[in-house]
């Protein structure tokens, strides 16, 4: 029996030695450009065939256990239009296991993303990817795999959205046709706790095709099943600088979103801010041509079509001001009210 134990001990010892040698060799192998290029080619060939469209990864650089770097990533949609193009994508891994993955930071540089709704169906051009990864088994309990992320950084990225069912607006910010150039974004302090998702928007600046220039945007963001809340908000636009302790909206039932202007309740606490009416005109085209600089503070609350204002302090030029509490009329038909500067 002792002899058998010794033989087994030696056998397992040799086995683990070879396993260790294999792991070391694999660690060196996976670092070679030849092996990583092979992985990239296999991955792109696989998804090109699965999705029946063009997929390409120019370069893969993997540092075992803590870093994945991709270069020249390209995905076309089923109409052969460019869906995603990324010059470089870096994933810094903090830790992982069988049921969890924690990413310390995701860094995307010089990317281009174009998302659009088809005419006349309204189907999104990325739907084929969503369908591919959707589970066909709706009866089984999903695995409890958790993905955590500490920080996202976007550098010099372009984001475009189009709904081709709706014609483009001639002036103003068109939410159905958005094209953001030179997007720079930093998001950190992610929390994902059940229905609550929260994060810190540390920096966001970009310029839209309409001419609206977001020179800076910072806020603490919280999203749950009853609404959205931004605290410690700072916004700098073309000629406006806005400070707000809170910008939030809430609803009791998701069905309220179908009648957004009448059933979703806002609460906006604006601290002393400087707003140019030309910037407001991006959101309210009827005010196009106005360029007065307004000093403003106060709390705006209630539904969009029946806003109320408390502690309003509005100042224009040197001697014109308005202070008080206001109950605004229904602006559901803005064109019915003549705006003049």
Language-model region placement:
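N-terminal type II signal-anchor transmembrane helix
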Residues: 1-50
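A short, amphipathic edge element
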Residues: 51-58
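Structural motif
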Residues: 64-65, 224, 303
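Transmembrane beta-strands of outer-membrane beta-barrel proteins
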Residues: 231-233, 269, 310-313, 325
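Outer-membrane beta-barrel translocator/channel fold
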Residues: 276-277
